[in-house]
A protein has these predicted regions:
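Flexible "cap/lid" subdomain of the alpha/beta-hydrolase fold that forms the substrate-access gate
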Residues: 57-61
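Flavin (primarily FAD) cofactor-binding/catalytic cores of flavoenzymes
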Residues: 2-55, 71-212, 216-218, 231-387, ...
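The conserved 3'-phosphoadenosine-5'-phosphosulfate
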Residues: 384-399
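Active-site segment of extracytoplasmic enzymes that catalyze sulfate/phosphate-ester chemistry
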Residues: 64-65
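Short, surface-exposed amphipathic charged segments that create phosphate/polyanion-binding patches used
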Residues: 221
Length: 435
């Protein structure tokens, strides 16, 4: 097939596979590209760009995360490991015959519009497994290369004589054997890895600059994210009610040494981990203040304390990274692209991003619904349908409010955060217009 009649789809992780399935389902011709030799993206630990580690599991339950049309087996754990998830994505790809649409081992080097017209074609330069470069033009582009691969590595004043790594380099707790370890950041990965370190390290401390809300994985013997949600509460009331319930189950993290959060619940992504509080309570992990400076093996903290470490592991998150596209194509505004519904580039008809969205409880089905909308829109553009033309006009205008009434922290990792309910409603309503 002539490539100018195809959509180029970049990535075969969860969002990329969702895109492939929906384009396939709606009869939109496409060519997929995946730099690795297999599907799974982040969840394929063998992928050089994967940042998962040996002990990694979902922090949301399988029933709140899976693709609705392809449920995980009952035999799969409530919170599956990366191994189970890779099996799941392989099975998903095989069940729907998606592999045949991909060129594996092929890295996209550059994506550029042929012109600045909204309906422009797109020129892709790729590098195959043999190192040969190839350039072709496509009708449109769907970017689904993930959001958790490019480390956000901080810099600290002073000089450090020990080992300084980002969690993206962490794979196994063997790294900690006999070492004095400082983990910087207490997000979900930081807390998971601190728990890993307890069993191998000589000492484990965790440095934080703000407080957190800690959500247990199980409540009354059931995955916590499967409870509640049937009654829609205003944001202010849900924050108050859920924070109270959390204190009943998890206690007050301030008593464990964490700062009191300077924000209300859900204004930043909660930490789904109660084991970290268990180990702090048992003296296995010590909470430290923010870092002031490094001095040899000594770390000096902003509360005036100091301690020596052999290894500092920065659990400081990731940056959005679309190196093959000029920032202006994606309408970058500050810390992230400004896209309509976190999907559509306002200046181009057929440039979309899947997976550039974060929300507590959105799951892969939320990304699938993004892909469903993209497939319907692209198909509608081909026929000039009224819903497609209406969406084309809407995405060039002011974006809808997707906050659900929450005041999210102005942090880089929150730059593309939305409220799950507000977001899914907006995406579903947009897709329903094509029915």
């Amino acid at each position: 097939m002539d490539t100018t009649e195809q959509i180029a789809l970049i990535g075969a992780g969860p969002s990329g596979l969702a895109g492939a399935r929906c384009l396939q389902k709606h009869g939109v011709a496409f060519q997929g590209f995946e730099a690795h030799d297999d599907v799974g993206g982040l969840w394929n630990i063998h992928n050089p760009r994967s940042t998962v580690y040996e002990s990694a599991h979902l922090i949301s339950s399988k029933r709140m995360t899976e693709f609705a049309e392809f449920p995980m087996a009952d035999s799969v754990a409530d919170y599956p490991s990366h191994r189970e998830l890779l099996d799941y994505f392989r099975a998903f790809a095989d069940h729907f015959g998606l592999r045949q649409h991909y060129r594996f081992g092929t890295r996209v080097q550059k994506v550029e519009p042929v012109s600045q017209a909204p309906d422009t074609r797109w020129r892709l330069t790729t590098e195959g497994p043999d190192g040969a470069r190839h350039t072709a033009e496509y009708k449109g582009v769907v970017v689904a290369n993930g959001t958790l691969a490019e480390p956000n590595m901080p810099t600290f004043p002073g000089q450090y004589a020990g080992e300084l790594l980002h969690t993206s380099a962490y794979k196994s707790a063997a790294l900690f054997e006999g070492k004095r370890v400082l983990i910087v950041g207490a997000g979900n990965s930081g807390c998971d890895i601190a728990v890993d370190a307890v069993h191998r390290a000589r000492r484990v401390d965790i440095s934080v600059r703000r407080g957190y809300y800690f959500v247990p994985k199980y409540v009354f013997g059931r995955p916590a994210d499967t409870l509640g949600g049937k009654i829609r509460l205003p944001a202010w009331l849900k924050q108050r009610v859920d924070a109270t319930i959390l204190r009943w189950f998890s206690g007050d993290p301030v008593r464990m040494g964490f700062p009191k959060p300077e924000y209300r619940m859900y204004e930043s992504h909660p930490v789904v981990n109660s084991l970290i509080l268990h180990h702090i309570g048992h003296g296995d992990v010590k909470v430290r203040a923010d870092i002031e400076r490094l001095d040899g093996h000594t770390v000096r903290f902003k509360d005036g304390s100091a301690a020596d470490y052999d290894l500092i592991l920065a659990a400081t998150g990731y940056r959005l990274h679309y190196p093959f596209l000029a920032p202006e194509c994606l309408n970058w505004q500050g810390m992230a692209p400004s896209l309509y519904l976190n999907i559509f580039a306002p200046g181009f008809d057929r440039l979309a991003v899947l997976g550039m969205v974060e929300a507590s409880g959105l799951g892969w089905q939320g990304r699938y619904e993004q892909a469903e909308l993209v497939a319907r829109y692209f198909k509608g553009l081909d026929s000039g349908s009224a819903p497609a033309l209406a969406l084309k006009a809407a995405k060039a205008g002011p974006p809808p409010d997707l906050s659900g009434g929450y005041r999210y922290l102005k942090l880089e990792r929150m730059a593309y955060y939305v409220n799950k309910d507000a977001y899914r409603q907006a995406v579903r309503q947009a897709a329903a217009r094509f029915a």
